[in-house]
Amino acid sequence: MATPQQPLLTKTHKQNSIISFKILTFVVTLFVALFLVVFLVAPYQFEIKHSNLCKTAQDSQLCLSYVSDLISNEIVTSDSDGLSILKKFLVYSVHQMNNAIPVVRKIKNQINDIREQGALTDCLELLDLSVDLVCDSIAAIDKRSRSEHANAQSWLSGVLTNHVTCLDELDSFTKAMINGTNLDELISRAKVALAMLASVTTPNDEVLRPGLGKMPSWVSSRDRKLMESSGKDIGANAVVAKDGTGKYRTLAEAVAAAPDKSKTRYVIYVKRGTYKENVEVSSRKMNLMIIGDGMYATIITGSLNVVDGSTTFHSATLAAVGKGFILQDICIQNTAGPAKHQAVALRVGADKSVINRCRIDAYQDTLYAHSQRQFYRDSYVTGTIDFIFGNAAVVFQKCQLVARKPGKYQQNMVTAQGRTDPNQATGTSIQFCDIIASPDLKPVVKEFPTYLGRPWKKYSRTVVMESYLGGLIDPSGWAEWHGDFALKTLYYGEFMNNGPGAGTSKRVKWPGYHVITDPAEAMSFTVAKLIQGGSWLRSTDVAYVDGLYD
């Protein structure tokens, strides 16, 4: 029997070593298990947690990798909610764009080709615009309302359009030079931002108010009164007249003198006459209205074109990107002619813009509805190839869209819509309009086929509804861009049209083409839905329909 000072069981040195080894083995095994949990299971749990944030992304793995980068750089944590991640992602995107600007400027300073310098100038302008749009979107997201969601979606759609436009302009550059601008990365980030936005907020489901006799609600009551007035009676802030009876002799001078970032409407009245100039309403010139003496009396004319060295973007006779832009009772034309190819008369990238009772004349690429929300009413647009193109969210009502006689071997395309991502809130809607032939086309209409449109980009979206289609429209209705490009991903629709060109029995059989029979589907392309008209155009006496005719 052991004494009180001795253990009941004595252990040898060898036994103690075995026990220590087992404990060490257990600790190592536990550490390895924890390692596997952290480095194998945790990423899986992270992916599960944030998969909803990236569920609408075209490349969900890329989207998740961007989120992972934010966490790795301690910009957000793995517990951050989707809204916080989106805002930080947008802040970092601004940083990326600001880094790209000096790179583009440096490339521009290293080349001598005028056309390429022009393209890079366009890119610099578009990058500056995009920085502002992303910053505005961050502020809108913070407000967490449905109307602000619609604003952010429109602005971020514009950012993606800006980047794609820049890339299109650089098509003649070497791949190495394009890679240096980081444009592919910016485009990817813009697409992911739209996908994140779609997952963290609820789209605006606007309530429609029946009736006619109103302008979309984003026109204020003061703007309504202005739009009811003639130019000479409007009480303009500035008057332009060629004969010296106004303060300015050119529209460009008057626009330059207008206040920057005005919170109230600033009106420029342009007296009758023909003004040969190119005019740009920059992003700083907000809430600007330009009004003339009528679409046949006040004419702004230019002739810049691609053949002579301009970029398509910069060829516009009048370009407007300042928010809240209104153009009324005026003609904008580009007289370059069909032999000069792309030659824009009017380019609009101004959010919540209104073009009312205007004439827009050119041939190829007449009206560049570039981006943001736009409304056209009682206007007259002429052209040949792709004469309404771009990636705005735009509605035309009570307009005449007039196909002209094109050049030899050419065909007329009324639209060429440029949506590049399904999360973009963009598309072209033609409602209560007449699509007809010009006097010079009528005698030879059978020699030059005219189509409602063709897909400029992969997710092109255009709807023609409740409109008159003249006999100039080819029975197939729509044309290919190149082979089967975009035929499965586009959305082209027709709803309740009339006229000799409105029959759909011989229309194209593409997967993306729709003869719309459900009014609820057509409603998505109305003023209230496509451009959220109920939230930014107040009631006016100018005829307007927010939904469909009964």
UniProtKB/Swiss-Prot annotation:
Query: Which ranges of the sequence are coiled-coil?
Result: none
Biological process terms from the Gene Ontology for this record are: cell wall modification; fruit ripening; pectin catabolic process
Catalytic positions are D365, D386
Alphabetized, the UniProt keywords read: Aspartyl esterase, Cell wall, Cell wall biogenesis/degradation, Disulfide bond, Fruit ripening, Glycoprotein, Hydrolase, Secreted, Signal, Zymogen
Site description Transition state stabilizer, residues in chain = Q364
- Source domain of life is Eukaryota
Q: Give the SUPFAM superfamilies listed for this entry.
A: Pectin lyase-like, Plant invertase/pectin methylesterase inhibitor
Q: Which InterPro entries match?
A: Invertase/methylesterase_inhib, Pectin_lyas_fold, Pectin_lyase_fold/virulence, Pectinesterase_Asp_AS, Pectinesterase_cat, Pectinesterase_inhib_dom, Pectinesterase_Tyr_AS
Q: List the disulfide bonds.
A: C331-C358, C399-C433
Q: Which CDD domains match?
A: PMEI-like_4
**Glycosylation sites recorded in the entry for this protein:** N179
- What's an example GO cellular component term for this entry? extracellular region
One function term, GO molecular function aspect? pectinesterase activity
Give, as in the UniProt entry, the pathway in which the protein acts.
Glycan metabolism; pectin degradation; 2-dehydro-3-deoxy-D-gluconate from pectin: step 1/5
Reaction catalysed? Answer: [(1->4)-alpha-D-galacturonosyl methyl ester](n) + n H2O = [(1->4)-alpha-D-galacturonosyl](n) + n methanol + n H(+)
**Broad class of where this protein is predominantly found:** secreted
UniProt-annotated location(s) = Secreted, Cell wall
Q: What is its EC number?
A: 3.1.1.11
Q: Which PROSITE patterns match?
A: PECTINESTERASE_1, PECTINESTERASE_2
Its biological purpose is as follows: Pectinesterase may play a role in cell wall metabolism during fruit growth and development prior to ripening and may be required for preparing cell walls for softening by polygalacturonase during fruit ripening.
Per the record, the similarity remark reads:
In the N-terminal section; belongs to the PMEI family. In the C-terminal section; belongs to the pectinesterase family.
Tell me what else is known: The PMEI region may act as an autoinhibitory domain and prevent untimely PME activity during transport.
Q: Which NCBIfam families match?
A: PME_inhib
Protein name according to UniProt: Pectinesterase 2.1
Q: Which organism is it from?
A: Solanum lycopersicum
